[in-house]
Amino acid sequence: DTAKIATFGLCGCTAVAVVSEYLDGSKSAHVQHFSPICQELSESVFRSVMTKNQGVVSRKVVVMVPGQWVQNGDGNTIIVPKDQASLNSLLQAGNLSDDNSVKVYPYRVTSGHRYGQGTLMVELGDEPVIYTECIQLNLTKSSS
């Protein structure tokens, strides 16, 4: 059986999807929408979920954050997290680092576009799949 869980319409909020696999072969998924109004409570709930490490073999985490367009050193325009301090606080609350098991996806926050306003979904089947903006992510260890 396949189960799906999602959040959408982030419109400036942050969302996190966590897929955990356990020693017994079972899997779990957690999707959370972080409102700036109750950030402290949201981080507390997230911390509680992330500290349940009993029997976890692997964990994949995707964080969607509001983004902003900047010009990088090569002169290319790229989208980066708008508030790196909030992202760092969230990663710290979950006892995570911005490494290969954590993928950060900044999304554009504009009033004129419905697409790209923050959709995050987990499909939990034989092989868990995470989607951002309805696009399947490659979460293998070799991805960049």
Which functions belong to the PLM regions below?
Residues 1-144:
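Active-site microenvironment for binding and transforming phosphate-containing groups
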